[in-house]
């Protein structure tokens, strides 16, 4: 997981690209999904691969019963859309820092967070019960720049795609 300082850099980068300060930038799909800016997402660069996942205490029955579940996350927009797509009503608590502590402190029934290896979850007695979506670094482009500098950008994108380890 990224530190909050790194996360702020990516958020600023989206803002800079969206408002034309930069033509292009590289940001994580997590930041793109959470912020939903106005830009083009052109290439999955492929590094920083991990996933968003729903995790609970081992042995919990998150999907059982009729009570509204509480979910802790750093990513409330992504979490809300995930559960809306399932037709599930959940309470979302936005937490910065160690989200995995929320179920242990009985603050939440589960968490939605970035998972790379799952080690931190296991260390805290949690398990992934559902993958939300894969994430990785993406190349984004300002919408006006794409129109004004289309050939240059397409040439650059082609170069990037030719050099991505697949």
Residue map of PLM features:
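Glycine/small-residue-rich loop that forms an oxyanion/phosphate-binding "nest" at active or ligand-binding sites
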Residues: 13-49
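Paired acidic/hydrophobic, glycine-rich loop segments that form the ligand-binding mouth/hinge
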Residues: 22-27, 109-115
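Single conserved hydrophobic/aromatic residue that forms the stacking wall/gate
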Residues: 1-6, 10
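A local structural motif
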Residues: 4, 84-95
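Short, hydrophobic alpha-helical packing/hinge segments within bilobed ligand-binding/sensory domains
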Residues: 13-14, 101-104
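Extended ligand-binding regions for polar small-molecule ligands
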Residues: 58-73, 77, 84-85, 134-166
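Small-molecule pocket liners
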Residues: 6, 48-54, 134-139
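Ligand-binding "clamshell"
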Residues: 34-44, 119-134
């Amino acid at each position: 997981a990224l530190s909050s300082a790194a996360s702020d850099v990516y958020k600023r980068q989206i803002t800079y690209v969206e408002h034309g300060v930069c033509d292009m930038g590289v940001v994580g799909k997590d930041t793109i999904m959470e912020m939903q800016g106005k830009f083009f997402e052109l290439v999955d660069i492929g590094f920083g691969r991990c996933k968003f996942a729903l995790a609970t205490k081992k042995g919990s029955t998150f999907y059982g019963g009729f009570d509204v579940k509480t979910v802790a996350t750093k990513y409330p927009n992504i979490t809300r859309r995930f559960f809306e797509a399932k037709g599930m009503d959940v309470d979302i608590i936005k937490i910065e820092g160690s989200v995995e502590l929320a179920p242990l402190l009985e603050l939440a029934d589960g968490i939605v967070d970035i998972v790379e290896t799952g080690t931190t979850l296991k260390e805290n007695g949690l398990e992934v019960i559902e993958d939300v979506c894969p994430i990785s670094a993406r190349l984004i482009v300002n919408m006006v720049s794409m129109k004004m500098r289309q050939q240059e950008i397409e040439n650059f994108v082609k170069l990037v795609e030719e050099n991505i380890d697949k």
